Amino acid sequence: MVHPPPPPPRLLLVALVGLLSLREVVAEPAEEAGTPCPEGLWPVPPQVLPRVTYTQVSQGQAEGIAFFYHPCAHPWLKLQLALLAHLYVAKPTLIPDFSLTWDRPLVLTAWGTALELAWIEPAWVAHWLKRQRRRKQRKSVWFLSDNLFGPTPTMPASRRGKLCGRRCVQAPTLAFALRSWRPPGAQVTSRGSGRSSISVVKRRGLRAALGLQSTPPGLRVSLASSQSLKAQQLTLGTSSVAPVSLTTGGPGGNGRSRTEAQMPSGQGNHGGCACPGQVSPAPRAAGPPRVARGPTPRTEEAAWAAMALTFLLVLLTLATLCTRLHRNFRRSESIYWGPTADSQDTVAALLKRRLPLPSRRIKRSRRRPLLPPTPDSGPDSESSD
């Protein structure tokens, strides 16, 4: 009997453990090993929105990124925090802290601010780190104008909070894949409207937690669907889909150019980690090709309507041209209005000239004979008459 292959999350976990050498990370520090939890390990807390606070940190930690966790937190959360630390920071700092609470046992501090988490959300963490990094750079412009492209002389390069190091291999893809991991006993919500509503709530919650500040379209957090998550888990070595672009922030001469990496506007691809000597990630895999649809009744009706309108427009144009030509055509002289020398005839003259005159009746006298006299008739005949 052939056993089914393990699910994608397990394969991904094994690959990450072997890739990132987590034996150094998962091992508990000496200070944590001797502090047992009186009530045992805490269960996994419910998933709540992250909270951003301002902290007072030492001078050594002011310019770096540190990851705090409660020693009694669930081991699954510790493992996720360790993976996240190695993905985003070259030399992560994992510090146990007993002052954390059960509802938010994980805290990420960077440049004087802290992000308290209940679960590991790589998309939110990456977006928050990106914003904090840019705020820090905007502040440093006013005070360190001469050293914009390098570290300050008083601060070592390792404390600059470098977000990408030697182990940055497809970091955005791995970090985004962490979002699909569920702790033991957690139920995965079904696909459909429920998942879409949860994603909308998470987007709104992220904006509320981060201060309701507008971000450029290239930095907005995009929550992928379950199908894209499975595809990213299966194609770990080739895919490079990420919710946000991680910055390098290195101390080199081109550190600012790597930090301010621009997104290609045409493809909407959020690039991977821009490490030195690393091949640029492949563009985002396009969706299934759209099948060409045939003409529908509505499109045919629209085509006929367009043809009819075109015909009417042509007909109207021809009629207008014909009217213009007819008006400009020189007609012959009228039989009623003849040409005049001075064109100053009066109405009476026109009527007298044009109206037909009545025929005169000739009056005949009674004494004149109707017939002319004959030569035979003489004066006798006249006297007899």
Curated annotation (Swiss-Prot):
The keyword Transmembrane applies. Coiled coil: none annotated. The keyword Transmembrane applies. Keywords: Cell membrane, Cytoplasm, Membrane, Signal, Transmembrane, Transmembrane helix. Residues 281-297 have a biased composition (Low complexity). It comes from the Eukaryota. The chain crosses the membrane at residues 302-322. Residues 242-297, 359-385 are annotated as: Disordered. It is found in: Cell membrane; Cytoplasm. One of its GO terms (biological process) is response to UV. Residues 323-385 are cytoplasmic. GO terms for cellular component: cytoplasm; plasma membrane. It is a single-pass type I membrane protein. Residues 359-369 have a biased composition (Basic residues). Residues 28-301 are extracellular. Residues 1-27 form the signal peptide. May act as a tumor suppressor. Inhibits tumor cell growth, when overexpressed. PANTHER family: TUMOR PROTEIN P53-INDUCIBLE PROTEIN 13 (PTHR34179:SF1). This is Tumor protein p53-inducible protein 13. It comes from Mus musculus.
